[in-house]
Amino acid sequence: MNYEKQDNLLNAFKELLAQERFGSQSEIVQALQELGFTQINQSKVSRMLTKFGAVRTRNTRMEMVYCLPNELSVPNTKSPLKNLVLDIDHNHFVVVIRTTPGAAQLIARLLDSIGKADGILGTIAGDDTIFVTPTLDANIADLIKSIRNLFETSI
């Protein structure tokens, strides 16, 4: 699929979810097919729902429907970092960073690029959680301070 078609599909997908009238993935598939996206199937819709952090919620008619909450939108290159980091916590051995859904790998990659010079041995990232392991000589309080400064947050 070329980029223009993919962008058109993603835009149509987002517009459909904004209507808050689709209660099942098969309804979304059917609507996209009616818009001319004939190669769409349930598994592709499922992946897009996951990618964009879609949730099922009740609409104004009290029907369970899929929607894309604004506060859970997928990060992009224009997202300010401080908006992606929700919480930073730690114990004596590891720092745990909670992010918006889909942002953990982006933030972890940034932390990995900073590297050992600032006390970061490595990171492990899921969808919305990052484990940061400090180097042996790193003071955990100093590491927390530098991470918070990086994300301009006082969490």
Curated annotation (Swiss-Prot):
Molecular functions per Gene Ontology: arginine binding; DNA binding; DNA-binding transcription factor activity
GO biological process, one term: protein complex oligomerization
Keyword terms of this UniProt record: Amino-acid biosynthesis, Arginine biosynthesis, Cytoplasm, DNA-binding, Repressor, Transcription, Transcription regulation
Pathway(s) served: Amino-acid biosynthesis; L-arginine biosynthesis [regulation]
Alphabetized HAMAP family for the sequence: Arg_repressor
Function: Regulates arginine biosynthesis genes.
Protein name, UniProt field: Arginine repressor
Organism for this UniProt entry: Pasteurella multocida (strain Pm70)
Encoding gene (name): argR
